[in-house]
Amino acid sequence: WGATVITNLMSAIPWIGQDIVEFIWGGFSVNNATLNRFFALHFLLPFVLAALVIMHLIAMHDTVGSGNPLGISGNYDRLPFAPYFVFKDLVTVFIFFIVLSVFVFFMPNALGDSENYVMANPMQTPPAIVPEWYLLPFYAILRSI
């Protein structure tokens, strides 16, 4: 139901909206494959956000810097984005990924939830994402679009 409401917003796009909805669903209806695709996209979203953060750091702190948006030459009044701090942060990130890799590759179920092994049911909203009663009018409005 939630996948239907969210993706039906795409159907408001003229001419190609319905095609986009069917592409996202993987067919003409929401079924187990669609829900598994949504779960996979929700897994990938943090990595996409991390990539955007890295792109921001590269774009804003490379040559011009966020303290000099006009690109005016005058490095004497601009603080550098200290390489020491970048290196320190990279060491921290690498240590985090090493620890995370140990869990992922050697103990995959240590931090898991037994709910992860339950097959998705397209006819039942999972209890963790059941909408609150005060949001139901807004969901009704979205469904009517």
Swiss-Prot record:
<keyword id="KW-0479">Metal-binding</keyword>
<dbReference type="Pfam" id="PF00033">
    <property type="entry name" value="Cytochrome_B"/>
</dbReference>
<comment type="similarity">
    <text>Belongs to the cytochrome b family.</text>
</comment>
<comment type="function">
    <text>Component of the ubiquinol-cytochrome c reductase complex (complex III or cytochrome b-c1 complex) that is part of the mitochondrial respiratory chain. The b-c1 complex mediates electron transfer from ubiquinol to cytochrome c. Contributes to the generation of a proton gradient across the mitochondrial membrane that is then used for ATP synthesis.</text>
</comment>
<dbReference type="Pfam" id="PF00032">
    <property type="entry name" value="Cytochrom_B_C"/>
</dbReference>
<keyword id="KW-0249">Electron transport</keyword>
<keyword id="KW-1133">Transmembrane helix</keyword>
<feature type="binding site" description="axial binding residue">
    <location>
        <position position="56"/>
    </location>
    <ligand>
        <name>heme b b566</name>
    </ligand>
</feature>
<keyword id="KW-0408">Iron</keyword>
<keyword id="KW-0349">Heme</keyword>
<feature type="binding site">
    <location>
        <position position="61"/>
    </location>
    <ligand>
        <name>a ubiquinone</name>
    </ligand>
</feature>
<dbReference type="InterPro" id="IPR005798">
    <property type="entry name" value="Cyt_b/b6_C"/>
</dbReference>
<keyword id="KW-0830">Ubiquinone</keyword>
<dbReference type="GO" id="GO:0046872">
    <property type="term" value="F:metal ion binding"/>
</dbReference>
<feature type="binding site" description="axial binding residue">
    <location>
        <position position="42"/>
    </location>
    <ligand>
        <name>heme b b562</name>
    </ligand>
</feature>
<keyword id="KW-0813">Transport</keyword>
<keyword id="KW-0472">Membrane</keyword>
<keyword id="KW-0679">Respiratory chain</keyword>
<dbReference type="InterPro" id="IPR016174">
    <property type="entry name" value="Di-haem_cyt_TM"/>
</dbReference>
<protein>
    <recommendedName>
        <fullName>Cytochrome b</fullName>
    </recommendedName>
</protein>
<dbReference type="InterPro" id="IPR027387">
    <property type="entry name" value="Cytb/b6-like_sf"/>
</dbReference>
<keyword id="KW-0496">Mitochondrion</keyword>
<dbReference type="GO" id="GO:0006122">
    <property type="term" value="P:mitochondrial electron transport, ubiquinol to cytochrome c"/>
</dbReference>
<keyword id="KW-0812">Transmembrane</keyword>
<dbReference type="GO" id="GO:0005743">
    <property type="term" value="C:mitochondrial inner membrane"/>
</dbReference>
<dbReference type="InterPro" id="IPR036150">
    <property type="entry name" value="Cyt_b/b6_C_sf"/>
</dbReference>
<keyword id="KW-0999">Mitochondrion inner membrane</keyword>
<feature type="transmembrane region" description="Helical">
    <location>
        <begin position="85"/>
        <end position="105"/>
    </location>
</feature>
<feature type="transmembrane region" description="Helical">
    <location>
        <begin position="38"/>
        <end position="58"/>
    </location>
</feature>
<dbReference type="InterPro" id="IPR005797">
    <property type="entry name" value="Cyt_b/b6_N"/>
</dbReference>
<comment type="subunit">
    <text>Fungal cytochrome b-c1 complex contains 10 subunits; 3 respiratory subunits, 2 core proteins and 5 low-molecular weight proteins. Cytochrome b-c1 complex is a homodimer.</text>
</comment>
<dbReference type="GO" id="GO:0008121">
    <property type="term" value="F:ubiquinol-cytochrome-c reductase activity"/>
</dbReference>
